[in-house]
UniProtKB/Swiss-Prot annotation:
One family name in Pfam for this protein: TP_methylase
Species this protein is from: Stutzerimonas stutzeri (strain A1501)
Modified residues (Phosphoserine): 128
Signal peptide: none
Name used for this protein in its record: Siroheme synthase
Gene name per UniProt: cysG
Gene Ontology MF, one: NAD binding
Highest taxon above the source species: Bacteria
Pathway assignment: Cofactor biosynthesis; adenosylcobalamin biosynthesis; precorrin-2 from uroporphyrinogen III: step 1/1; Cofactor biosynthesis; adenosylcobalamin biosynthesis; sirohydrochlorin from precorrin-2: step 1/1; Porphyrin-containing compound metabolism; siroheme biosynthesis; precorrin-2 from uroporphyrinogen III: step 1/1; Porphyrin-containing compound metabolism; siroheme biosynthesis; siroheme from sirohydrochlorin: step 1/1
Protein residues bound to S-adenosyl-L-methionine: 225, 301-303, 306, 331-332, 383, 412
Length: 465
């Protein structure tokens, strides 16, 4: 090991930065976050750097570096493009026993800056010893995805109770077991969900020896339109810890595969005129499973609150006192339009956008057609494949031009995506000649014409243009 990792308490202590440019500013920001008092020396200092230093009660010296600038400093940073000056700062600092870092010159450094993942008070540092800083940053980026931002709250909870736990358990082994149970159980889940008061209550009860009750919970998670890369970090974390998964027809198989492998999987999908499981039964099933102490993942395509009946499900949970979390997902309108190269709003074409259900009931759509036919707006119809001819006819009948551009997106954001473009007057006829597979999304408006120059996600699906 070439360098020993240490964490330095810089609160209120003076750090010298030689240099007044962008590199010095980046170092100053990091040091300021650690509570250091900054002394910046350079003939010319950027305004942002001056402002940052003054906000932290530091000092800016508008002149060249002098050896005495190191007096009283616990760390020195050379951040200039003047190599002889950087070498001089390093030499002086080493002679005085002051740790020194010279940017991009590891051979002149007695200390180096790692790549940092900050979940204060939890901090992770990654270093290559200055040999491969880009690699260290790439590893840091991966760690950023593994450690939720809320872990800082969890670490803060541990700090709050540390003294009490130490007083309760004199044995180090007992304390270790206690904290492992906390960090891997429902107390941690409450903290990560932002329910700090509940986490504190449960932790206090655990310290007092109160037997915990089986604490079930429902995670209502939006799975997005299909591409697994569009899942949120929070969604993925909950997917990988649930005991049982209830999933819809619109959830892509690649996303279901990301769920915890030993979790029970229950299909509750619906399709037109065929509800495999009635909604009321789904609601009750969520309540029953959660009251058994299970962590229940309710996985829905798109966003659970946009034509997903998620509101009905959590109403039932709330009525029965079942804890729940809601994780929004990228709704099909946003995801499919973006992957099709169709901006839903545009200053020159559409000043508003409306999301509408295209689901037919008794062969018709009960919609405010006169409002929908107004110009300068984009319409997005969910579940509109079967009702496509009726939708196009009604919009034209109520005043929308038959020449209005329209697009039908099949299985958007996935490798099976196909985009069919035409006009309101011709789209239904074109779709009748194609083998279109649900799920689909219908987009109507002048913005559709922008696809000709903005389409980017094509590949094998280009044949559907």
């Amino acid at each position: 090991m070439e360098y020993l990792p240490l964490f330095h308490n810089l609160k209120g202590r003076t750090v010298l930065i030689v240099g007044g440019g962008e590199i010095a500013l980046r170092k100053a920001r990091l040091l300021s976050e650690a509570g250091a008092r900054l002394r910046v020396v350079a003939p010319s200092i950027e305004a942002q750097l001056v402002e940052l230093v003054q906000a932290g009660a530091g000092e800016c010296l508008d002149r060249g570096y002098a050896r005495q600038d190191l007096q009283g400093c616990v760390l020195a940073i050379a951040a200039t493009d003047d190599e002889p000056l950087n070498a001089t700062v390093s030499q002086h600092a080493n002679a005085l026993g002051v740790p020194v870092n010279v940017v991009d010159s590891p051979q002149l450094c007695s200390v180096i800056f790692p790549a940092i993942v900050d979940r204060s008070p939890l901090v992770v540092a990654v270093s290559s010893g200055g040999d491969a800083p880009v690699l260290a940053r790439l590893i840091r980026a991966r760690i950023e995805t593994w450690i939720p931002a809320a872990y800082g709250q969890l670490a803060g909870l541990a700090k709050q109770f540390r003294a009490q736990v130490k007083a309760r358990f004199a044995n180090v082994q007992q304390r270790r077991v206690f904290w492992e149970e906390v960090f891997q159980g429902p107390i941690a889940e409450q903290a990560l969900a932002g329910r700090t008061a509940e986490a504190e209550r449960l932790l206090a009860e655990k310290l007092a020896g109160v037997a915990p009750k089986a604490l079930g919970e429902v995670y209502l998670v939006g799975a997005g339109p299909g591409d697994p890369d569009l899942l949120t970090f929070r969604a993925l974390r909950l997917m990988q810890q649930a005991d049982v998964v209830l999933y819809d027809r619109l959830v892509a198989p690649a996303i279901i595969d990301l769920c915890r492998r030993d979790a029970d999987r229950i299909y509750v999908g619906k399709q037109r005129a065929d509800h495999a499981v009635p909604q009321e039964q789904i609601n009750q099933q969520l309540v029953t499973l959660a009251k058994q102490g299970k962590r229940v993942l309710r996985l829905k395509g798109g966003d659970p609150f946009i034509f997903g009946r998620g509101g009905e499900e959590i109403e039932e949970l709330a009525a029965h006192g079942v804890p729940f979390q809601v994780v929004p997902g990228i709704t099909a309108a946003s995801g499919c339009a973006a992957y099709a190269g169709i901006p839903l709003t545009h200053r020159d074409h559409a000043q508003s956008v409306r999301f509408v259900t295209g689901h037919l009931k008794d062969g018709s759509c009960d919609l405010p057609w006169s409002e929908l036919a107004a110009p300068a707006q984009t319409l997005v119809f969910y579940m509109g494949l079967v009702g496509l001819p009726v939708i196009c006819q009604q919009l034209i009948a109520h005043g929308r031009s038959a020449e209005t551009p329209a697009a039908l997106v099949q299985q958007g954001t996935t490798s099976n995506q196909r985009v069919f473009t035409a006009t309101l007057g011709t789209l239904a006829g074109r779709i009748a000649q194609e083998d279109v597979q649900a799920p689909t999304l219908l987009i109507v408006g002048e913005v559709v014409q922008l696809r000709e120059k903005l389409a980017w996600f094509e590949g094998a699906q280009a044949a559907g243009r």
